[in-house]
Structure formats: C-alpha cells, structure tokens
C-alpha cells in the first residue's frame, strides 16, 4: 500500500506548493512509511507527492514520482501490477522496451503507457492500482483506477485548482478545501454503510469509479468542466460476456475442476 496526492492548476500553483504537497503526503504517511517523493513542474502548474511502501523493488530504482525513459511521462502509483513481468516481456519482444533501471512494476507501467497509450495499457494491466500520470508532451493529467476499485482515488476542484489523493485526509491539506458535508450522500451511507463512487462525503469532491480513467488539461480547468470518466472495464459487461460464452460442462466435477484451476491461476498471479 502506498499513498498518492497531487494538484494541477489552470494558471499558477499556490505559493509554497512543495510544502503543501509534503503536508498532504504526511497526512497519508501511514500508507507509505518507507519513502517520500515530491515532484513539481511550475511551468506546467502541476505537482505530485508519493508515500512509498516498498514491496517489489526495494532499491532507490523504485522511487516515485518516476519519470519515463524518454522523459515524456511522470507517474505516481499506488498498488501492485501482478502481470508486470508479462508486460515487460511483451515490450521486449516488440523491441520497444527501454533500458530497464530496476525491476519495479512502476517502471513496467510507465514503459507500457509510453508504448501502447493509456486505454490499451489499462486493458492489458492486471492488478490493484490508483494511478496519476502526467503527459508532458500533451500537457494532460490522467487519473485511473483498477477494475474492482480496490485502491481509492478522490479528486476535487478548489477554484482553478484540481486536487487528488488516495484519501480525503490528503485533500484537506490543499488550499481552498471547504469540507462541506454532502447531505444528499448521507442516505447512501446509511443504506450501504459506505459512500459508493462517484460520490464522497464532501461536496465538490468525487471518487473515481472502478474500471475508469479521467483526463484533465489546464484548458478543461479553465472552462470549469467536469469530464466524464472513460470506461475501460465493466463488471456488468464482463458478466454478460461470460454468460454468452459460457462453456457447457458435462458434470459437476468438471465444473469444480475448472473453477479450481481458474482460482489457482488468479491467486498464483498475486504471489
């Protein structure tokens, strides 16, 4: 488990943005006690903070925020990509792999985004994750969440400033945070015992739905638009496809064996 947070401005970043990001990171330090990283590009009016819990690559090569081999992309990422070695192998076979600096899944993810783009990479990726990706070339911020929404990702608009984070605690440290309770959501909280996406307990702060990604640019912030998430995976569509393509087992034993095989494959990919 790691923690991420960041801001994107339509004009200028607040004064002392590095310290603000450090405070946002400190608010979620329990998510990543091993390392902290801050990256700010004042010319692009964007800043990231990452709290790291080292799991796969324990070396400094896994430090975040991480910049891609070409320098085009900057990423902060919370979670784990279970098939990142498969992604590396596919990149290497295509001849488009970079010179690997380490063996972190973050680096694999960055190289995949650079090679295949956002949507194709998300569809190939198996894991639990919340991602913030800055495209320096197109001046575009991507926020993405895993298929089942295992890793949280909140975002909100504070004037001309977009802020996002793994937890609401991080957003409370951003200038302009109001903390006004969304009373319309209280009914959902009482009914489900949690606040479902795309809502949060606060006005003007949303939770990115599972299996989706968002694009933000300074122009979008200037127009005060609220972009609609792109869906790269849907549980409902997956279920309908499964029913349509269902295999007709000849016995209960055959069905049980097939289920056991599928579960073993799924669990082994996470070991």
Residue ranges and their predicted role:
Residues 1-271:
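Cysteine-centered catalytic environments shared across enzyme families
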């Amino acid at each position: 488990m790691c923690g991420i947070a960041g801001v994107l401005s339509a004009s200028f970043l607040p004064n002392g943005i590095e310290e603000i990001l450090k405070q946002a990171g400190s608010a979620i330090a329990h998510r990543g006690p091993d390392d902290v990283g801050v990256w700010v590009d004042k010319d692009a009016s964007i800043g990231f903070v990452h709290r790291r819990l080292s799991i796969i690559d324990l070396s400094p090569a896994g430090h975040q925020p991480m910049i891609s081999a070409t320098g085009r992309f900057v990423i902060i990422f919370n979670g784990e990509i279970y098939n990142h070695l498969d992604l590396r192998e596919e990149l290497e076979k295509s001849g488009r792999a970079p010179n690997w600096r380490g063996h972190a899944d973050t680096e694999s993810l960055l190289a995949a985004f650079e090679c295949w783009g956002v949507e194709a990479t998300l569809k190939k990726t198996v894991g639990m994750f919340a991602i913030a990706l800055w495209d320096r070339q197109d001046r575009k911020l991507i926020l993405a969440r895993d298929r089942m929404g295992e890793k949280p990702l909140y975002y909100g608009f504070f004037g001309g400033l977009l802020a996002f984070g793994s937890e609401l605690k991080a957003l409370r440290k951003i200038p302009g945070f109001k903390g006004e309770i969304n009373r319309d959501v209280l009914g959902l909280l009482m009914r489900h015992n949690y606040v479902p996406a795309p809502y949060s307990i606060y006005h003007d702060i949303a939770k990115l739905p599972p299996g989706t990604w968002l694009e933000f640019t300074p122009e979008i912030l200037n127009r005060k638009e609220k972009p609609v998430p792109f869906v790269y995976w849907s549980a409902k569509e997956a279920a309908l496809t499964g029913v349509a393509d269902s295999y007709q087992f000849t016995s209960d034993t055959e069905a049980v064996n097939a289920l056991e095989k599928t579960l073993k494959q799924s669990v082994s990919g996470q070991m």
